[in-house]
């Protein structure tokens, strides 16, 4: 006789099913994040190897050049420049990978898995127990460790320059500081042979001074005691009319003229290396009066124009070569910014445009409404960021006072709006993290400069103040330039804060007697 056996059915409950699904989801997410981290580690390792490869190529080029050159001893001075170039290139790659590691594919997912608050720091990976060495003795390395070691190994030496034997100059106090500091070692005066100084630019411990009347350029090197030595004086030619110039290395300068000729000068020989017409193949030429900004990074040159809201980027070939070889244009990109997404008939204005935080990208600040737009070099829209400006700004969009400053080390963007408002946008947190209102009153115009997370604020009456990018709060190192009177001047103050001496940023400005003033910035 058959015995009826009772069938046992599984008993499911809603909490049990939810627990099972959550467990499986967490497991899958951990596996996926582990794969993302491994991929990021590989990117970091690739960047490190590419940097080593680039370094070896530079050294090989130098050895080959010295072998065929009858003046081998003179060629040796280019070796530090080539090494510095490769180190800076590796550092840029590493910074970009750090930014990618902080992106939504990895760190934001870690945040959601660990149920963290939105404003917390996003760098703790230990809670998931991923990417750690195995008990069997695996030698797997954490990706951030690779990046940190690479940054330490590739940190450029600010003291490195064309010469190591500066000559002393006369030093005396030229600043009356707000806190009445008596340390005169942080202040220096340098005599220049130029009749006046119109442009100041710096690179490491070297600075370039330009006189637009005589078309002359002076290159100085500054030591830890703020003593200066004149390294070279270069005549750019009477037909030269400079809009902007950039340092390529301690031995080369890139000059952009109003005729849109791009000239590369050798500092060591004080000679012209190459002259390229940027618009030789262009059907729509630029006008220098329409130029909003010119930016340069690595081998990319960007020029933004108000005319039809156009941006052009040139890829320069041979620009990173350690030898004095002519440059040429490898490729040109054209991007037209429009406001087609808006239903209104109001036109959008480009206020500023700079090269982006990642390779082949740019960041654009526009009005109506005030927003950031990120494009790639093919013109593809990557992101739009509404700045949510809900108050009326005093300055008009077509006026000066709208600028972007990118700090790649912290992945933050400093935004200046109409001489009166500062914003800080974080690419890590994908939002505006700081806002600060300036009170310029009668001291317009205001100029900004950003160097190593230190914001230099210049007022047209000769006042300078310094703020930290982390909180936008002014430091105690405020001062007024003595022997100077800008009360009746309306043009901007000529200054630069990118000079680095003994790992310390230095402010450079000029007084009414055409004396170049140096001031060590204390934060």
From Swiss-Prot:
Compartments it resides in: Cytoplasm; Endoplasmic reticulum
GO cellular component terms, A-Z: cytosol; endoplasmic reticulum; endoplasmic reticulum membrane; FAR/SIN/STRIPAK complex
Keyword Protein biosynthesis: no
Residue ranges of the region described as Disordered: 61-80, 150-171
SUPFAM superfamilies recorded: WD40 repeat-like
Keyword terms, alphabetized: Cell cycle, Coiled coil, Cytoplasm, Endoplasmic reticulum, Phosphoprotein
GO biological process, one term: regulation of signal transduction
The keyword Protein biosynthesis belongs to this UniProt entry's keyword annotation: no
Pfam families given in the database record: Striatin
Modified residues (Phosphothreonine): 132
Coiled-coil ranges (or none): 26-76
Residue numbers bearing the Phosphoserine modification: 115
Biased composition (Polar residues): 160-171
Gene3D superfamilies: 1.20.5.300
Biased composition annotated in UniProt, kind: Basic and acidic residues: 71-80
Note: Present with 4010 molecules/cell in log phase SD medium.
Task of the protein: Participates in the control of the reentry into the cell cycle following pheromone treatment.
Subunit structure comment from the entry: Component of a complex at least composed of FAR3, FAR7, FAR8, FAR10, FAR11 and VPS64.
Name assigned to this protein: Factor arrest protein 8
